[in-house]
Amino acid sequence: MTCAEPGCAGVVEDGYCVVCGTAPAAATSAGAPAESSVTAATATAGDGRCAEPDCGGTISDGYCDTCGTAPGPPATATVTTAAAPISKATASTRSSVRTGRSSSSKSSARGHLGAGMVDVPRVPRVDPVSAIMADPQVAESKRFCGKCERPVGRSRDGQPGRAEGFCPHCGTRFSFAPKLSRGDLVGGQYEVAGCLAHGGLGWIYLATDRNVGNRWVVLKGLLNSGDVDAMAAAVAERRFLAEVEHPSIVKILNFVEHLGSDGVAVGYIVMEYVGGTSLKQILRDRREPDGGSLPPAQAIAYILEMLPALGYLHSLGLAYCDFKPDNVMQTDEQLKLIDLGAVISMDDESSAIYGTVGYQAPEIAHTGPTVATEVYTVGRTLAVLTMRVPQRDGHFGELPGPDTEPLLATHDSLYRLLLRATDPDPEARFASMEELADQLTGVLREVLAAEDGRPRPGMSAFFGPPRAVFGVGGAVLPADVVAALPVPLIDPGDTGAALLATTAGTSPAELEPAFEAGLRAVVTGRAESMEIPLRLVRAALEVGDPEDAIRRIDLLAETIPGDWRLSWYRAQALLLRRDFPGCYTEFETVYRALPGEPAPKLALAAVAELATAATDGQDRGVGDAGRATGFYDTVWRTDRGFVSAVFGLARLHGMGGRREDAVTALDQVEPASALYTEARIAAVDAILAGRGPTTLNEAVLREAGNRVQRLAIDSKRRGAQVRMRVLEAALSWLEAGGAPGDDAPLLEVGLDREGVRTGLERCYRDLAREAGDMWTRIELVDRANAVRPRTTL
């Protein structure tokens, strides 16, 4: 039976699709459209019958009396798969006040993860029977008392430790032996096949559901029935997870109790069986041959696939708490969170908090679970997947730095993202999974572009496109950089957003009265809008008044302290002042907050280049040509829409004597670009730059000439300028004794003194006719007369 889910080519086995995991829709009458298989599997029939495949039970007290499944929303309801962040004190105001528009929170199409950009290796579906442990035992090194947490069940005097007994320190009973055996029937419905694993809350069993087509299910029992916290966690799990419906989260089917051989009732969570491989095992398989880690793009794709699921839990007021590679399972190309034992309400101030040392946020014991603590676990997990994180006392320690981890030296944006995600200050971390996904997607684009050289442009949720291009055909000027940099997107929810869209003006003097008049016509007051004062800051920068801009920024800082937009605009004001160190520091603040965005990298590159030029390359602090080159290269390699970056890259290559690299970069500008011709002209300049008569040769001259010949230059003045550049170089070479190897023309004139002089005379006279003032015209005519070939009558 083929899967009826749109876009899925899988087949249904054991009641579920082997590709997307969806149950088949209930049969419909001829000619009637089939409902979505997701809603059909969870909806309730109109007469109260359970709609679970192969189940004939009825819904009683909110659950099926046969299979135990809770009914889902009506068939017409839409299951939400992405969530907005919850409103809680963890939202950061220090580095990110708003999220803006997001383009990365949607689930990617199957076959490609990481916003559809990464094709990860498929993991075959594991035969459930093959996953059963032959000899289920808990290693002695992992046996600890559930109450005092001291070692129990250890070997002594050559005798193996006991799997069951009483703690010698506090007297609490412990049991690490499986409580269920093959063939046991739990809850009168689930037949045990064997043990799969031992987790933090006890043994996990494989079983078949005898009431629903013998489908495979997983039973998770408690570590110790006498452990009050563990029992409470199981009960809480059932309560919370009854409402959880997400394609990337394991489905909780039921909660049952079973009377053990000791007469004690033990609770079990019944979950869907996810047959695949955990990320922990995938990482282990990768490390066994050569000690390597997962490719960064693959690891990022895994994380991106799970962020919507975590965000969904947050929208319900729940925290996952124990995100780590062990708890993410890949089957084929689908990922799922498989262990929800640590899930807790963010408002729960009394329940025990479960997690794993090395992944868990350091402040969670004091703050409880928050979005910030969740972000921390994601950052730690990404680090463990991509690099060797040092261990201390058997747990992962501090993250390595670029000086010891080559991956971080290669991908600085990834390093910055990890630093923010795991910042010791919770308020400095990403404010939501959506915001983290936005930045991680940007980092992924950079990583992929660095790996194969193919650009991966993307829509920013924080910035608009570049407004102009700076540094084309001349030196970089601070005012040109400010005029070209992207502008932060306006928050559509701001009270002044509509007014900004309808108000014209350029200077603060023009805009302020218009804003005052507009705000008087609406109910909301000016003090409620942050976008209007930010627009006035930008207006001050656009008219070249950094002092007014800084004054306005200082006033705003009292209302929205730490907002990255203030640093963005303050940096531009300092740039107009030519305060390069201060400017660089402010742009660096934006980069730390938004490591996946190209805009702050472009700004940092421009400032580093300007500082290098201002200090003749002697300042190795801000004025670092190598740093500027790296930023320009990253931006251009990732997104060809930032054309300023390629001109900056070419300038710095030229300054370093790397002519071929400069030309190669400029040749990457596509013919469809408005700057295509300027890039080709700049390439000609790069070929000839710094060459005297002794370092020129015929091949260089002909390459430059052929490039000019192929250009379609609309401007007569611009065409004359670039021809003049080549012919002047040719004349200096000829007059230094250069001799061409053949009589082929150069730019339609002979490559000899008379031909080149004739061509130069024509260039000077063309430029004179296009000159805007008399003195320039006179100078060009004089140069034409001086270079014209001498003739004798």
What are these regions (language model features)?
Residues K251-G267:
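Short beta-strand micro-motifs within the conserved protein kinase catalytic domain, predominantly
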